[in-house]
Amino acid sequence: MTKKLTIVKCPRCGTDVEWGEQSPHRPFCSKQCQMIDFGEWADEEKAIPGAPDMSDSDGWSEDQY
């Protein structure tokens, strides 16, 4: 039985990466690409879209919800 090889693109640089145990940083091609991406999330350069945070300055009250 032939095992199917899955190839994905590194989300940081676009390099082809084999999806499997031989690629410990998957989906990234390297530790460097993984850490650059992590830094972008930590610096809030990347975010998952959603509703804005509610804070006291937004005029929020418990009566609204």
From Swiss-Prot:
Cofactor stoichiometry and binding remark: Binds 1 zinc ion.
UniProt-recorded Gene Ontology molecular function terms: DNA topoisomerase type II (double strand cut, ATP-hydrolyzing) inhibitor activity; zinc ion binding
Residues the record lists as binding Zn(2+): C10, C13, C29, C33
Region entry Disordered, spans: 45-65
A Pfam family reported for this protein in Swiss-Prot or TrEMBL: YacG
Swiss-Prot/TrEMBL GO biological process terms: regulation of DNA-templated transcription
Composition skew (Acidic residues), residue ranges: 55-65
Cofactor(s) listed: Zn(2+)
SUPFAM superfamilies: Glucocorticoid receptor-like (DNA-binding domain)
PANTHER family membership: DNA GYRASE INHIBITOR YACG
Subunit structure: Interacts with GyrB.
Protein name as catalogued: DNA gyrase inhibitor YacG
Native organism taxonomy: Bacteria, Pseudomonadati, Pseudomonadota, Gammaproteobacteria, Vibrionales
Annotated gene: yacG
